[in-house]
């Protein structure tokens, strides 16, 4: 799906906007799915790629956030193996606090989703662990400050 912001008043752009306006053509109440799940690598690059998706959803369907329908699928950073049993850890700190209780285990650092075996990826898809994206109470003011027309508000915020 592609999100395009069009501010031009040309005839071609108006036609494009009418034909491709995602917001007008899709209502959150008529979506075929209960939730939107975003899955990326658990490293900084993967987490950084989430923001454009969030912005697209937020600027078109803020009600999905209010309803708790935007979620991150947590992906493991470390998989500890004891025999055939696996334990997944979603942060290094989580692993560090549990490692002493795991006897004779091996670990595997997951560099990205491509590091998962097919069975692990299937498990993650079939039994996802979610983080629900929650908005602060003043989200409308924050969004207006960060994305609105008043650059002075952003400059003031960034200088704090």
Curated annotation (Swiss-Prot):
It catalyses: ATP-dependent breakage, passage and rejoining of double-stranded DNA. This is DNA topoisomerase small subunit. InterPro entries: DNA_Topoisomerase_II, Topo_IIA-like_dom_sf, Topo_IIA_B_C, TOPRIM_C. The keyword Isomerase applies. It is an enzyme of class 5 (isomerase). There is a 50-nucleotide untranslated region in the coding sequence of gene 60. The ribosome apparently skips this region while reading the mRNA. It comes from Enterobacteria phage T4 (Bacteriophage T4). One of its GO terms (molecular function) is DNA binding. Coiled coil: none annotated. Small subunit of the DNA topoisomerase that untwists superhelical DNA. Controls topological states of double-stranded DNA by transient breakage and subsequent rejoining of DNA strands. Its EC number is 5.6.2.2.
